[in-house]
Amino acid sequence: MKNEFQVIAELIEKEKKVLDVGCGDGTLMEFLKNNKKTNIRGLEISKSKVQECIAKGLTVIEGNAEKDLAQFPDKSFDYVVLSQTLQAFLNPELVINELLRVGKKAIVTIPNFGYWRIRLHLLLKGTMPITKTLPDEWYN
């Protein structure tokens, strides 16, 4: 598991209700479910990633956080996690506000865009690189 996921897991208390927004293949969800005994749900925009999660026995719905977080009641989760996904949204402020509304606590992580290799790639190619931690194209 990525070091970042271990840090996130340390911030979450056992047996709490968690929503993982942009949960990808469900790696963090699996870890929290098995090691923290969380009641965890996921929201993911990619149909194939949703299917991967469901195949692992995880509860995930397909949806776009910019629109679909509005369907969740206020403070319906103890924690809402947004890991390495904020940069993909057209309206990140809206998403952050929805995270804070839906969860009692929000945990948000972002890629380190200051890392010299990422900056060099951006300078030379004009796009963000595709890496192990950012495997999808999310930029225009």
Question: Which functions belong to the PLM regions below?
Answer:
Residues 22-24:
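Class I SAM-dependent methyltransferase "Motif I" SAM/SAH-binding loop
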Residues 79-90:
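A short SAM/SAH-binding and catalytic strip from SAM-dependent methyltransferases
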Residues 93-101, 105-140:
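S-adenosyl-L-methionine-dependent methyltransferase catalytic module, highlighting the catalytic core
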Residues 70-79:
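A short acidic, Gly/Pro-enriched loop at the edge of an enzyme's catalytic core
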Residues 31-68:
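Class I SAM-dependent methyltransferase SAM/SAH-binding core
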Residues 26-30:
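Glycine-rich SAM-binding Motif I of class I
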Residues 1-15:
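Conserved alpha-helix/loop element of class I SAM-dependent methyltransferases that forms part
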